């Protein structure tokens, strides 16, 4: 999934420095990914640590992490399940009616793919409530649908707007592919809570923080993934069909510094790592001044290519600086 703030390309940098600071052997460690997103960082440490605690405010993220982090054993008959969901007949449901030209002025998906999403989503729910699948298989199928639907979405990566014409990838027919995950012998925990509240209930060894960098709320940028995941009817509003959504204090310039310091103050973890770039709402000095109050602070930086939701959009620079702020409490 092409995701704003994804750390996929930075995983080697993050892993190298976490191991260097904490330990090369993390087999007994509890690792918390508090702003998990698609779970890419937690997935990188899943086999290396004793337990992953994964959390995000958004439900689509909860679904992805229940699969990638929460699932630790092979799903029985997963190929048969994928084939069963792939074979369902088209259905004109909520996505078709509100997010394709077949039922609205919105063109997030082709008419065929919108019907496929509706049919597949309803089939997954049917399998769950008929008790033909357990929660592990349910989240595997639902995560597979989110990943597969995202590949044929008619957007410039985020769902804040749709494209006027169907791009080539959006013209391809949706095919459900399994969202495979790493197996593990250790049970993990997955939450969908406000980070400021969850931090009071958990503890561990390594806390990895990757909060939003700017004022764009993820609930708005990825609203359609939430809509597919929850599949709860509502009245879509405006040109983009945006539902009501939760707002993070980390996307507010007026609230972020206080929210960040409260998080650090309450954290019961020895090692804290914060990923943040040089264009975020918090400045490098502001972050450093807060972290220095609570222990030994250091900073490591890396220059890398910026994320572009729209390749045609002009930017001042092609690269951005990723900062890994490190605190040992």
Predicted regions located by residue number:
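Conserved SAM/SAH-binding loop
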Residues: 192-197
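S-adenosyl-L-methionine
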Residues: 1-34, 40-48, 63, 71, ...
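A polyampholytic, Gly/Pro-enriched intrinsically disordered region
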Residues: 74-84, 210, 316-328
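Class I S-adenosyl-L-methionine
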Residues: 163, 284-329
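Conserved proline-anchored active-site loop of SAM-dependent methyltransferases
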Residues: 31-45, 54-59, 201-221, 275
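Conserved Class I SAM-dependent methyltransferase catalytic core
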Residues: 250-298, 303
């Amino acid at each position: 999934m092409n995701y704003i703030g994804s750390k996929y390309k930075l995983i080697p940098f993050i892993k190298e420095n976490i191991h260097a600071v904490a330990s090369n052997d993390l087999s007994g460690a509890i690792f918390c990914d508090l702003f998990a997103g698609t779970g890419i960082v937690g997935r990188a440490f899943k086999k290396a640590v004793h337990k992953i605690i994964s959390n995000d405010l958004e439900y689509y993220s909860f679904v992805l992490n229940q699969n990638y982090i929460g699932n630790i054993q092979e799903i029985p008959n997963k190929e048969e399940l994928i084939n069963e969901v792939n074979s369902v007949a088209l259905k004109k449901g909520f996505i078709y009616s509100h997010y394709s030209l077949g039922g609205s002025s919105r063109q997030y998906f082709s008419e065929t793919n919108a019907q496929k999403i509706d049919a597949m989503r309803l089939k997954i729910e049917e399998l769950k409530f008929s008790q033909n699948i357990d929660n592990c298989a349910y989240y595997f199928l639902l995560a597979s649908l989110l990943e597969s639907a995202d590949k044929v979405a008619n957007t410039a990566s985020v769902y804040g707007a749709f494209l006027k014409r169907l791009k080539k990838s959006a013209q391809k027919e949706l095919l459900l592919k399994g969202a495979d995950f790493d197996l593990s012998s250790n049970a993990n925990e997955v939450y969908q809570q406000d980070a400021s509240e969850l931090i009071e209930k958990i503890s561990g060894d390594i806390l990895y923080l990757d909060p939003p960098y700017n004022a764009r709320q993820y609930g708005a940028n990825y609203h359609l993934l939430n809509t597919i995941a929850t599949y709860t009817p509502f009245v879509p509003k405006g040109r983009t069909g945006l539902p009501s959504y939760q707002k993070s204090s980390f996307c507010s310039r007026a609230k972020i510094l206080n929210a960040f310091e409260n998080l650090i103050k309450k954290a019961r973890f020895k090692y804290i790592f914060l990923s943040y770039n040089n264009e975020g709402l918090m400045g490098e000095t502001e972050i450093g001044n807060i972290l220095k109050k609570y222990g030994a602070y250091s900073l490591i930086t890396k220059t890398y290519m910026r994320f572009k939701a729209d390749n045609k959009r002009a930017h001042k620079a092609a690269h951005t600086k990723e900062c890994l702020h490190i605190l040992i409490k």
